[in-house]
Amino acid sequence: GEKVRKPVEYIKSLDRLIALNPDVILPSHLDPTIGAEKIRKGMQRIRDAVQYVHDETIAGMNAGKTVNQLMKEIKLPPNLELVQNHGRVDWAVKSIWEYYMGWFRFESTTELYPIPAQDVYADLAQIAGNENLIALANNYLIQGEPVKTLHITEIALAGDPQNASALALRDQALVELLERAENGLRNDYEIYWLKSQLDTAP
């Protein structure tokens, strides 16, 4: 999974590298970057983008917004746009939040205990009835809400792991998310994960 990043330390590291004015950079990923001006401009853009996301996240936290609200709201301005195939702004927001706040989000008492929501999914499925859950999941998919579709199909499948309708809706939601990822940010991790979920689907 994604580790919690250290934005302040990362910004300081970029400032140190910029001050060195290197002619060649050997990154951890991809090919070497050559040319002092190209390197300087690239690192300055990354530094300023990270600083922007950091500051916007802190401002949102101080305004009392939840991490999920900020993940939806915070976007890079046009002058700081970056390719997000290795990282994503919304994931960076979550990482910055946890860097300062830790794992407890102050949203639900249940976060304090080792009993996840999934432990009651089968009971929810029994009470709600799989027919109703399938209808709700399908409505979310029609409305263009594949993540909500996945939430509901997870509940349905907890009650009936082999339910063909729930499995089909889950796969349709995964395909829609994969298409969005491939036609949008093209984030490698997101694409690999979605493909792996489709490959391992029963």
Language model regions located:
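Hydrophobic/aromatic side-chain positions at a characteristic register within alpha-helices
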Residues: 2, 61-62, 141
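Divalent-metal (often Zn2+) His-rich catalytic cores of metallo-beta-lactamase-fold enzymes
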Residues: 7-69, 73-107, 173-174, 181
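TPR-adjacent "capping" and linker segments in tetratricopeptide-repeat scaffold/adaptor proteins
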Residues: 45, 108-134
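Short coil turns that delineate tetratricopeptide repeat
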Residues: 161-162
